[in-house]
Amino acid sequence: MLKPPHLSLYIHIPWCVQKCPYCDFNSHALKSKIPEQLYIDALIEDLDTDIKKYGLAQDERALHSIFIGGGTPSLISPEQIGRLLNEVEKRISFKSDIEITMEANPGTIEATRFEQYRQQGITRISIGVQSFEQEKLKRLGRIHGSKEAINAANLAHSVGLNSFNLDLMHGLPDQTVEQALNDLDKAIELNPPHLSWYQLTIEPNTLFYSKPPTLPDDDKLWDIFDLGHKKLTQAGYVQYEISGYSKPGFQCQHNLNYWRFGDYLGIGC
């Protein structure tokens, strides 16, 4: 009998402190306090509906990975994240080596909060750094500064997570090749097990789409990618997807399940 593919779960948290001008995800700037308990309750109802729809028995399939994305999931308290994961596990068992990733904004993270997320079951944090240059962060609408980004990476090292990722963008408005590579050097110096190195793209229904900034031309973009790829390779990172680089053994299992045509459920709005 053929074994079923891995099963993963994506959980969406739609709130942010403010909407970034390049973001085309379903995310919304906070206008009042997040209704945490009500939203977690709704997520569980959403999961129950999927379980019934697909006929998933509690011990029939075990979850291989969970990814909590957004939005800014780190706006949700560790206690509510823990309650959410407990309710999920009551319904679908977890593999012993399950990867549970949560996205975090450096501007919403404190030392105790990282540790509390780990205690509640988070095994991997994805930190949305995007750039270490203050002017670029401002252009991107980010709420954090370079110091907060560096601090978040150091905290992730210190709390004993299985892994963590830094999100870094290149091809930013008016960015030179040197600036892009300096950003990458700073990220590599922080020695994350995983680096997601994305080129900025302008998507419909974003502020950047309605008011396009000046981006590097194709020649500069190629130089950034070519030289940056060499830097990452020399630093021991292996490219395993278009924008994903990791140290050996630290690939994002959730992403790999997508690329390998595994099964997944998605809940949230």
Residue spans for each PLM region:
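Local cysteine-cluster metal-coordination motifs and their immediate loop/turn environment
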Residues: 14-27
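C-terminal scaffold of the Radical SAM
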Residues: 3-8, 27-56, 61-269
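Conserved N-terminal Rossmann-fold NAD(P)-binding element of oxidoreductases
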Residues: 11
